[in-house]
C-alpha cells in the first residue's frame, strides 16, 4: 500500500536522488526505485557487480548496476518483508502504522525547519543558538564530573560568528607554512622538525600513516542513516592504532632533552600526536579534500582545539566512569589526582569539561551524531573567509540536514535533540577558546614543548 507525503518538504529519493512519489516498502522513494525493488524481491533476482561493488547510483545512471542499486535500497532502509509474495499490488498493511509515524516525524521536522528559519529546498543552514557564558575545559586535560565556577572567556572581539553560533576567526593564512606542507598530498609527513621523535618516520624505514578501520558496515543493519553520516563513519580513525602510535612516541627518548618530561609536557605530546591524526582525518573528509590548501588551513586553524576537546569528550562518554578520565593512551587518571596536582585554573577547567560530558551523555549522543557534529566543527568557520564559499556552505547545509534527519528518525521522542546538540557545540567552542588561552600562557612560561604542530596552531590566530 502506498501512502502520500507532504510535497512541500521537497523530498528526494534516498537511492537515486529522483523526486519521491510516496511511501514504498518502508520509506519515501521514487517510482523507479519502487518498481525496481519490487521486481527484484518478487522475482528473487540475483545480481553481480562488474566493478568494485561501489558504483555511483543517481538518477542518470541508476540502471547501470542493479547489484549496487539493490544494495543501496537495503542500506537506506527499504524493507524486504514489505513486498507481497503473491505479486498483488500494494505493500503489506502491517507497515501502515510505520508510515503514519514517519509522516508525523516529517511534519515535526518541517515545523522545526521553519521555526529555525532553515531553507527547505537545500537543507538547513545553521542559525546561531542563544549565546551562553560557559567557561571552559582545556583541550588537553578535560575530565571530571561536577560544575566548578571558572572565569568566562573574554569577549569575542574581532571574532566572527560561525554557522552554529559561536565565533569563528578571520585569518589571512599563508600557504607555505608547516601545516600547508602537511596538507599537500605530495608531502604527507611532518614538514616541521619536532624536538620529539617523529612517529611517522624512522631513520631506517618510513612508518605508515595513521590507519583507518575497515569501512563501517553500511548494509541493512543501518537503515535510516543519511549517506553523509555513513561516509563519515568509514573515515573515523582507528582508536587502537592511534593509541599504539602515541604510546610508542612517548616511550622514545627525547632528543636533546635528557631531563624527564613533566606530566604536563607528556599531555602536550599526546595532544600534538592526536592533532596529527585529526589533520589526517580532515584530509580524507568529503568536501574538505576538494578545497584548496589555503582554505583547508583556514578551517583547521579555526577549529583544531574544538576538535581536540570534542575528541576527548566523546572518549569520556564511551569511558563512562565519573571518578576518572580516560587518556588517548588508554590510561585512567583519577579525578582526585587531578585535584591534588593541577592548579586551581586547570582543575576548574577539568570540572567544566566533565560537566559537558554529562550533558552529552544525558542527550544520549551516539557515534553517528558524533561524526556528524565533528564534521560541523570542521566547517564552522564563516564561509566569507574562504575562497570556495559555495563548496563550504554546501557542506555545512548537508551536515545540518543529515543531523536533523538522523535525530528526527532515530530519536523521535526527543524532538528537541537537534537544537540541544547544536547548543553543546557552542559550549565546545567556548571551552576550546579558554583552553587555548590557558595553553598559550603555559607556552609563554616555557612549559609546553616547542617546535611542534600544537605550537604552530597556537600561534596561527595570533599572527
From Swiss-Prot:
The modification Phosphoserine is found at residue 202. Residues 135-148 have a biased composition (Low complexity). InterPro entries: NHR-like_dom_sf, NR5-like, Nucl_hrmn_rcpt_lig-bd, Nuclear_hrmn_rcpt, Znf_hrmn_rcpt, Znf_NHR/GATA. The modification N6-acetyllysine is found at residues 34, 38, 72. Keywords: Acetylation, Activator, DNA-binding, Isopeptide bond, Lipid-binding, Metal-binding, Nucleus, Phosphoprotein, Receptor, Repressor, Transcription, Transcription regulation, Ubl conjugation, Zinc, Zinc-finger. PROSITE patterns: NR_LBD, NUCLEAR_REC_DBD_1, NUCLEAR_REC_DBD_2. Residues 10-85 bind DNA. GO terms for cellular component: RNA polymerase II transcription regulator complex. A 1,2-diacyl-sn-glycero-3-phosphocholine binds at residues 343, 438, 442. There is a cross-link at residues 119, 193 (Glycyl lysine isopeptide (Lys-Gly) (interchain with G-Cter in SUMO)). CDD domains: NR_DBD_Lrh-1_like (cd07167), NR_LBD_SF-1 (cd07070). Acetylation stimulates the transcriptional activity. Sumoylation reduces CDK7-mediated phosphorylation on Ser-202. Gene3D superfamilies: Erythroid Transcription Factor GATA-1, subunit A (3.30.50.10), Retinoid X Receptor (1.10.565.10). Expressed in the pre-granulosa and Sertoli cells of the ovary and testis, respectively. In the testis it is also present in the interstitial cells. In the adult ovary it is expressed in the interstitial gland, and in the granulosa cells and theca interna of small to medium-sized antral follicles, but is not expressed in large antral follicles. Pfam families: Hormone_recep (PF00104), zf-C4 (PF00105). It is found in: Nucleus. A zinc finger (NR C4-type) spans 13-33, 49-73. GO terms for biological process: female gonad development; hormone-mediated signaling pathway; male gonad development; positive regulation of gene expression; sex determination; tissue development. Transcriptional activator. Seems to be essential for sexual differentiation and formation of the primary steroidogenic tissues. Binds to the Ad4 site found in the promoter region of steroidogenic P450 genes such as CYP11A, CYP11B and CYP21B. Also regulates the AMH/Muellerian inhibiting substance gene as well as the AHCH and STAR genes. 5'-YCAAGGYC-3' and 5'-RRAGGTCA-3' are the consensus sequences for the recognition by NR5A1. The SFPQ-NONO-NR5A1 complex binds to the CYP17 promoter and regulates basal and cAMP-dependent transcriptional activity. Binds DNA as a monomer. Part of a complex consisting of SFPQ, NONO and NR5A1. Interacts with NR0B2, NCOA2 and PPARGC1A. Interacts with DGKQ and CDK7. Binds to and activated by HIPK3. This is Steroidogenic factor 1.
Amino acid at each position: 500500500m502506498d501512502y502520500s507525503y507532504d510535497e512541500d518538504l521537497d523530498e528526494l529519493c534516498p537511492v537515486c536522488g529522483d523526486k519521491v512519489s510516496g511511501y514504498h516498502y518502508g520509506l519515501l522513494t521514487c517510482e523507479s526505485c519502487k518498481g525496481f525493488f519490487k521486481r527484484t524481491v518478487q522475482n528473487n533476482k540475483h545480481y553481480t557487480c562488474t566493478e568494485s561493488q561501489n558504483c555511483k547510483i543517481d538518477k542518470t545512471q541508476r540502471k547501470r548496476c542493479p547489484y549496487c542499486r539493490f544494495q543501496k535500497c537495503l542500506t537506506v532502509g527499504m524493507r524486504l518483508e514489505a513486498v507481497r509474495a503473491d505479486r498483488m499490488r500494494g505493500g503489506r498493511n502491517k507497515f501502515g502504522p510505520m508510515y503514519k509515524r514517519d509522516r508525523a516525524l516529517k511534519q515535526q521536522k518541517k515545523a522545526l525547519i521553519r521555526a529555525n528559519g532553515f531553507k527547505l529546498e537545500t537543507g538547513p543552514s545553521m542559525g546561531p543558538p542563544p549565546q551562553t557564558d560557559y567557561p571552559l575545559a582545556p583541550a588537553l586535560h578535560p575530565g571530571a564530573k561536577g560544575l566548578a565556577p571558572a572565569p568566562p572567556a573574554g569577549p569575542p572581539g574581532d571574532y566572527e560568528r560561525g554557522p552554529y553560533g559561536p565565533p569563528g576567526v578571520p585569518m589571512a593564512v599563508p600557504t607555505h607554512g608547516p601545516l600547508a606542507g602537511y596538507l599537500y598530498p605530495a608531502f604527507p609527513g611532518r614538514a616541521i622538525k619536532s624536538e620529539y621523535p617523529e612517529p611517522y618516520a624512522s631513520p631506517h624505514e618510513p612508518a605508515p600513516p595513521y590507519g583507518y578501520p575497515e569501512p563501517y558496515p553500511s548494509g541493512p543493519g543501518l537503515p535510516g542513516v543519511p549517506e553523509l553520516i555513513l561516509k563519515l563513519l568509514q573515515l573515523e580513525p582507528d582508536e587502537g592504532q592511534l593509541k599504539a602510535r602515541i604510546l610508542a612516541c612517548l616511550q622514545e627518548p627525547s632528543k636533546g632533552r635528557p631531563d624527564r618530561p613533566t606530566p604536563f609536557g607528556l599531555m602536550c605530546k599526546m595532544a600534538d600526536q592526536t592533532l596529527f591524526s585529526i589533520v589526517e582525518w580532515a584530509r580524507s573528509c568529503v568536501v574538505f579534500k576538494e578545497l584548496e590548501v589555503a582554505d583547508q588551513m583556514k578551517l583547521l586553524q579555526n577549529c583544531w582545539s574544538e576538535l581536540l576537546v570534542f575528541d576527548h569528550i566523546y572518549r569520556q562518554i564511551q569511558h563512562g566512569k565519573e571518578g576518572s578520565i580516560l587518556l588517548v593512551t588508554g590510561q585512567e587518571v583519577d579525578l582526585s589526582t587531578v585535584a591534588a596536582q593541577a592548579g586551581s585554573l586547570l582543575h576548574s577547567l577539568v570540572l567544566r569539561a566533565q560537566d559537558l560530558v554529562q550533558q552529552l551523555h544525558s542527550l544520549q549522543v551516539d557515534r553517528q551524531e558524533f561524526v556528524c557534529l565533528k564534521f560541523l566543527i570542521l566547517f564552522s568557520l564563516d564561509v566569507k573567509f574562504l575562497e570556495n564559499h559555495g563548496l563550504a556552505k554546501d557542506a555545512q547545509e548537508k551536515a545540518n540536514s543529515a543531523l536533523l534527519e538522523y535525530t528526527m528518525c532515530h530519536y523521535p521522542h526527543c524532538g528537541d535533540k537537534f537544537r540541544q546538540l547544536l547548543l553543546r557545540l557552542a559550549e565546545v567552542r567556548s571551552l576550546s577558546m579558554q583552553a587555548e588561552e590557558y595553553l598559550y600562557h603555559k607556552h609563554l612560561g616555557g612549559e609546553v614543548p616547542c617546535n611542534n604542530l600544537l605550537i604552530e596552531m597556537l600561534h596561527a590566530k595570533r599572527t
